[in-house]
Amino acid sequence: GLFLFNKNHQAADEPQLDMSRIPAHVAIIMDGNGRWAQARHLPRVAGHKQGMQTVKKVTIAASDLGVKVLSLYAFSTENWKRPESEVSYLMDLPIRFFNTFVPDLVKHNVKVTVMGDITKLPEKTQKAVNDAMADTKDCDGMILNFALNYGARDEIKRAVQSIAQQAAAGELDPASITEDTI
């Protein structure tokens, strides 16, 4: 398996990491932070805060290892069903994350991208996300791709709606729809 290690302090008996086997794209579903906190008798938000610190470490490690794309499933469309106080905290996390971490991302040449419908996020969260993308737009190293307000069904729904609108406007022949259209 793949593991992380400190390059300068590797024990002699530890196996070497095969750099030719580093995946080009790593995707992580960030799930279980709340349960992690509850198991330690902490509030759920403490788990989300700890998760944010872990994301920072994983991002730098992935970049250092040569991963091309790191996708983090951070907030799904289903997460809106959580308690309002938890959702509010989760909406503030990107603000805190980017305010403290963008300089490190730029230093490591990491470009921030987002998939999902961020127009449904609070304005201050949208601003933090958009600022992070703008601040890292010239970086050409690893791509740090956040799935925010993302859900596969929602993505399919939005694609179908867009295609239907184009067809209704006479801009697209339904018979010409291919996988590439979607």
Annotated model-derived regions:
Residues 1-182:
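Flexible, compositionally biased loop and terminal segments
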